[in-house]
């Protein structure tokens, strides 16, 4: 898909690819969700194309993201599970390809493609700017003690329970665990940094930009789901917003609020594109890395996250693999269009 964009330099649009983490096919209003409100994502579908038969690269995080980045089907990709396999420095990713064609490249959020260092550094794989989590276990924690900015640790005001530091040894687990002091909500910091980057990149009129916004929500903090000191709540958020007064479990309020955060951040992105007068020359894509989860105290069926599909994350059924996919490119992608064409992560490259 992206290869088709490189006909002439004048044809090069900006590209924003947004990847939610463990968001189900049925979690968006435009895919039939009745309780959770997603007006900005529904707008994306209305102003572009909604795909009904789009498939993630795998049923879990790391291999799915590997397929997305390399364009290789899971049978050919290096990473086939959430283990210690990783991309090699000479592997081709679409970020590298875009960089070679003059794009400014930025990745914000959860990289999560292999471990340990140094080969899991997004810089090696085509991203000049990075802010977020390198390791997927670190990304379980919404309130980490640090994030990574271009290879350097940025200290936050959060503090883990001591036992998590002692129990989670090894580079692949660094920073993971459960926070007892929760002052900085990492998804918000990452979204703010993303918006700032779009402003900066758009000011360079001579180069288009590619942004990979890899969220770590609504994925659960799996570790927090078994931490009694915080009520086994793996879906903690700063506040529950409009869901605060609902008579539902706290974990479901947290999940609902995460969907709300995602939707609002998509709205922020669309607004800044309009503000900068670049929306007509920017492709915006939205998807999820696999089917919905049932972890951290959240129950997948509570909001019917897989819609009519069978199965969930980790299952080799439709519910584990089929994911939302929305594409908006004003004037190029028809508005209000629904595609039943089978497609997958390997097709993005």
Q: Where do the language-model regions lie?
A:
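Bacterial N-terminal signal peptides
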Residues: 1-4
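Formylglycine-dependent sulfatase
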Residues: 6-349
């Amino acid at each position: 898909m992206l290869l088709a964009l490189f006909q002439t330099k004048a044809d090069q649009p900006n590209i924003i690819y947004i990847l939610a983490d463990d968001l189900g096919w049925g979690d968006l209003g435009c895919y039939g969700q009745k309780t959770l409100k997603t007006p900005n994502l529904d707008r994306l579908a209305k102003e572009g194309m909604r795909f009904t038969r789009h498939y993630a690269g795998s049923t879990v995080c790391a291999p799915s993201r590997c397929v997305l980045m390399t364009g290789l089907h899971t049978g050919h990709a290096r990473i086939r599970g959430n283990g210690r396999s990783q991309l090699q420095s000479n592997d081709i990713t679409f970020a590298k390809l875009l960089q070679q064609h003059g794009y400014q490249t930025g990745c914000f959020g959860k990289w999560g493609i292999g471990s340990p260092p140094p080969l899991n550094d997004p810089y090696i794989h085509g991203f000049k700017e990075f802010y977020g989590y390198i390791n997927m276990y670190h990304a379980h924690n919404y309130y980490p003690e640090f994030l990574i900015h271009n290879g350097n640790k940025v200290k936050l005001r959060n503090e883990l329970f001591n036992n998590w530091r002692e129990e989670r040894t090894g580079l692949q687990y660094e920073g993971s665990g459960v926070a007892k002091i929760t002052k900085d909500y990492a998804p918000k910091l990452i979204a703010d940094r993303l918006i700032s980057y779009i402003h900066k990149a758009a000011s360079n009129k001579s180069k288009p930009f590619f942004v990979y916004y890899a969220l770590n929500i609504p994925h659960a903090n799996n570790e927090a789901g078994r931490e009694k000191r915080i009520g086994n709540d793996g879906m903690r958020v700063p506040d529950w917003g409009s869901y605060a007064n609902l008579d539902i479990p706290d974990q479901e309020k947290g999940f609902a609020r995460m969907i709300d955060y995602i939707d609002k951040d998509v709205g922020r992105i669309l607004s800044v594109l309009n503000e900068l007068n670049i929306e007509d020359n920017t492709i915006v894509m939205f998807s999820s890395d696999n089917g919905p989860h049932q972890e951290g105290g959240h129950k997948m069926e509570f909001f019917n996250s897989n819609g009519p599909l069978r199965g969930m994350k980790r299952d080799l059924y439709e519910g584990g693999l089929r994911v939302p996919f929305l594409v908006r490119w004003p004037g190029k992608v028809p508005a209000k269009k629904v595609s039943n064409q089978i497609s997958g992560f390997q097709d993005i490259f």
